[in-house]
Amino acid sequence: MTLADPPKTLDAFREDRTYLGADHRRNERRTWIVAAICAATLVALLVGGAATRSLALIANGLHMAAHVAALVVAAAAYALARRHAANTAFSFGTGKLGYLAGFANAVVLAVTAVLMAGESLARLRQPEAVDYHAALPIAAGGLVVNLICIWLLRPSGATLAKHDPDGDLNLSAAHLHLSADAAVSVLSLAALWAGERFGWRFADPAAGLLAALLVGQFAVRLLRQAGAALLDVNPSAELTGEIRARLSSGGEQVLDLHLWRLGPGHHAAIAVLQADHPQPVDHYRARLSGLAGLSHVTLEVRGAGADAAHGHNHG
């Protein structure tokens, strides 16, 4: 026997499928601001490089272009998710657009790490002369811009207070791009100082190789997190256990239970229960009230003698 949920109005139906993060608009606005700052820096570097014929400035500008692209992808994902939040063509809302953008930016980070490592290894084998006097202020300026942008993209106070492991991955990806670049700038400053002071020509490529390893570590971490969300990996064994315990608190048997992410701070659950004396679905749904982050629940309740053919078919 299956007990269906009571019918809902269209407005309620749409509201139930808006699974955006609590700070969605704030994060979208700040991501666009940071993208604009990086774009302005990019233009300044390219114009300055062309005017002074400095390859270092032009190279730094092209490097900044990768960050601008990553930030535009992140900001566009916010805008699209918000614009289509009520579009019923998306069965479970648009909250996962941020995970998709985060995954794409993680791939860019990984490719960047590989290219950095290749260039650094080549320069370790055959060190090239570096204009330390010109390169130091460029690295320092890049670090200042990155620190400003990192501050702008910091999580909100409420998010930090909750230590939410299922926070906004799109923001995390943009933040990691800038954090990785800031780390590269710090390593570059140290290497350039060592090269200028002690003549260590190997310091610059060695710092580049270390930075590549750091960026690669960031990329792998982000790929795992975004990939898990996109592939509907169970996000929380603790929440799954709590749902199971609450649904079976009256002696019912939980035959099937699935939990997955819908968006930042939002989860969905599907459960199949078997009860000797089935109650209306709202009776069991009430047991799950108050569970933070559980935004969508689908329940199927069967009597003890229900035909197994009514169950799900897991291929």
Regions found by a protein language model. Give the residues of each.
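Alpha-helical transmembrane segments and adjacent TM-loop junctions that form the membrane-embedded core
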Residues: 2-20, 26, 62, 70-80, ...
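First transmembrane helix
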Residues: 31-48, 145-148
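Residues that recognize and position ribonucleotide moieties
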Residues: 33, 55, 169
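Interfacial helix-loop-helix junctions of multi-pass membrane proteins
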Residues: 47-58, 126-129, 133
